[in-house]
Amino acid sequence: MDLPKAYDPKSVEPKWAEKWAKNPFVANPKSGKPPFVIFMPPPNVTGSLHMGHALDNSLQDALIRYKRMRGFEAVWLPGTDHAGIATQVVVERLLLKEGKTRHDLGREKFLERVWQWKEESGGTILKQLKRLGASADWSREAFTMDEKRSRAVRYAFSRYYHEGLAYRAPRLVNWCPRCETTLSDLEVETEPTPGKLYTLRYEVEGGGFIAIATVRPETVFADQAIAVHPEDERYRHLIGKRARIPLTEVWIPILADPAVEKDFGTGALKVTPAHDPLDYEIGERHGLEPVSVINLEGRMEGERVPEALRGLDRFEARRKAVELFREAGHLVKEEDYTIALATCSRCGTPIEYAIFPQWWLRMKPLAEEVLKGLRRGDIAFVPERWKKVNIDWLENVKDWNISRQLWWGHQIPAWYCEDCQAVNVPKPERYLEDPTSCEACGSPRLKRDEDVFDTWFSSALWPLSTLGWPEETEDLKAFYPGDVLVTGYDILFLWVSRMEVSGYHFMGERPFKTVLLHGLVLDEKGQKMSKSKGNVIDPLEMVERYGADALRFALTYLATGGQDIRLDLRWLEMARNFANKLYNAARFVLLSREGFQAKEDTPTLADRFMRSRLSQGVEEITALYEALDLAQAAREVYELVWSEFCDWYLEAAKPALKAGNAHTLRTLEEVLAVLLKLLHPMMPFLTSELYQALTGKEELALEAWPEPGGRDEEAERAFEALKQAVTAVRALKAEAGLPPAQEVRVYLEGETAPVGENLEVFRFLARADLLPERPAKALVKAMPRVTARMPLEGLLDVEEWRRRQEKRLKELLALAERSQRKLASPGFREKAPKEVVEAEEARLRENLEQAERIREALSQIG
């Protein structure tokens, strides 16, 4: 046997990771096997592995390895995303260290630098996934800006444009002054932030004033109206009149609109269509022309803006404007107020709103195609509740702003004629050809749109483009649609719904059959991990400390029902201990083979029990894999390995091995081989190493998945009675304060025949022998099918034992009384954190239960 005494993941995992990376599991579209396809959510090319990636890919790899062993042509398509904003920001920061900006380089040179960075650093995360054991088809690795994916993007846009679904129009958009690009609503994060609410008064035409409340006084100069609720009696007499914008000579109408909240502020709303989404909608209804006073750099500009504010940053302008309003008598009051601050999800800068032309995708007609499919059950969701969430979003979807003012990304294939201003987009049949003259007027003076597509535009094509679409490739014919999409619920709208749109529109069917949505990985307190909080758990550090198998197993074990995961390092310790337990069990089996001399070949009760339980386990665990309930599958295999195999069967097998029973050795080997197969999808490194040592076969990943055998219910029932007898004896020893190895004598009642028929096994496991008669005084432990009685005479000083128990009983009752007083205090329950109250309640229950057990033991001894 060549297994070292102790398991060290560092000596095992890297060699297998290297082997799988060098010899990837390449899919064959012509194999004739049923396909099973997973599209890997492409991580950002800028990224390093975080816990979300580790969870996501652990689940995907478990499914792909399971299906590969089930005989499917298992295809896991990997790749990375060009991550427009994120990548551009990374390279801009590198330039900043050189004292340069992207504008100093110009677009062409800047893009050369980005590609250079991508080639040097962009493969980091895929290398890290390989270290985690990801058995993807690395020969099919894709990048959202490589040649094939770029063709897909151009073709999709050409189709959308010529079908009237892609159009260019000026609209109010989210704008990041730092990243200098528009953002979709899904790329904007809103956080409650301490701020101020300012009440300002406007002079009303004909005399008097009207007061409004705002958190953005610097935008007053862009007001185009004051709106009040039509049913607000306070202001009904002012509707139709005009008010003057403070510090200006601009008069604006006072109008009625039902969108106004009567109970907010003064009940009157300043309407600033160019700088607020609600105001933009009100302006659209009332025909108000938007006026902007903040430019794309976030600075004040425009004729309406007082000279003292022009050119100032918007936040500096806010402070200065408040001073001017105060001095002029327009500031009624200033109060603390929690504002919903909208920020760029990439850089954290507070966003601005701006109106200028953008490319949009009409989502309503596209969503209808998806909704029909979802309503007829085309796509299953796990957990099922997310299906309704998906449908609700699609039913209320708005047009998608698909253009971004970046340099890194897919440049939009649209050209503008400098003579007649016509838009030129290549037709689908010539989608790769750049136009040389205007289709409308024939002019050769064409200028290409400088914007790029939103990163999610290319990501939305991922299930198609990874298979070679729009070409009719063998992969596309064989592997579309995919089977399972595994991803976090946080990108359901950003990505999953948009892939559904692409699939139904371009392929006429669903892009995948099932969507498995998992939760976020949080810290042990349930907080989102972030560098600023200092609570980030680095998966690579965990791999170094516990092993990749332990990390994978812990995350899978915790991924229940799509809920967020609170990751405590104790779970990683649990998984590492599990790996060690399995390793030691395998070493025992391998050691048992050395020098073994067969003297008999008879199935023991323990052999029959283990084979029967294994058959049941195979059936249940297979069903859980099929149901995509990987967390429960992990728990079932953990119980089967740790409890049934290691704790019970291995121990029960030792007397038979000592007696030279070949059937028992064979059972050990066969059961271990099956357990390694069941666990392989979740713990591929250790199981591969042990399977090779056990069987001499090179690649467990290519072995067949086990099939359930027959059940032996008689053996299971008999062995359960034996287990209960052993458990009862062990419990009695613990109650009496005796060491587990202490030899004792007990009297058994109930279903005792299995003990009598397997006396050697009972004696070995329980370290006990049987009394022929029931003792008068004894400690008693009742189990469902067996009751054990153990007299204390001859084992210990009964009176001393009694004194110790009575003393402990008093201590427990005192502790319980203290807990009861604390829990009865209204102040404690109201002020203490929920987890503190729950811990105190648990302490009370435990102390009362222990006290009751001691009372019972004392009454038994008499």
UniProtKB/Swiss-Prot annotation:
The annotation note on the cofactor reads: Binds 2 Zn(2+) ions per subunit.
- Positions annotated to bind ATP: 531
Chain coiled-coil ranges: 802-862
Cofactor(s) named in the record: Zn(2+)
Reactions mediated catalytically: tRNA(Val) + L-valine + ATP = L-valyl-tRNA(Val) + AMP + diphosphate
Give EC number(s), comma-separated.
6.1.1.9
The record's subcellular locations are: Cytoplasm
- Which Gene Ontology MF annotations are present? aminoacyl-tRNA deacylase activity; ATP binding; metal ion binding; valine-tRNA ligase activity
The record ties this protein, via Pfam families, to: Anticodon_1, tRNA-synt_1, Val_tRNA-synt_C
UniProt: Zn(2+) 1 binding residues:
176, 179, 344, 347
Gene Ontology CC entries for this record: cytosol
Q: Where is this motif: 'KMSKS' region?
A: 528-532
Family annotation (InterPro entries): aa-tRNA-synth_I_CS, aa-tRNA-synth_Ia, Anticodon_Ia_Val, M/V/L/I-tRNA-synth_anticd-bd, Rossmann-like_a/b/a_fold, tRNA-bd_arm, tRNAsynth_Ia_anticodon-bd, Val-tRNA_synth_C_sf
Q: Which GO terms describe its biological process?
A: valyl-tRNA aminoacylation
How is the quaternary structure described? Answer: Monomer.
Its function, per the record, reads: Catalyzes the attachment of valine to tRNA(Val). As ValRS can inadvertently accommodate and process structurally similar amino acids such as threonine, to avoid such errors, it has a 'posttransfer' editing activity that hydrolyzes mischarged Thr-tRNA(Val) in a tRNA-dependent manner.
**Entry's HAMAP family?**
Val_tRNA_synth_type1
The UniProt comment on domains reads: ValRS has two distinct active sites: one for aminoacylation and one for editing. The misactivated threonine is translocated from the active site to the editing site.
In the record, the note on similarity to other proteins reads: Belongs to the class-I aminoacyl-tRNA synthetase family. ValS type 1 subfamily.
Instruction: Write the protein's name.
Output: Valine--tRNA ligase
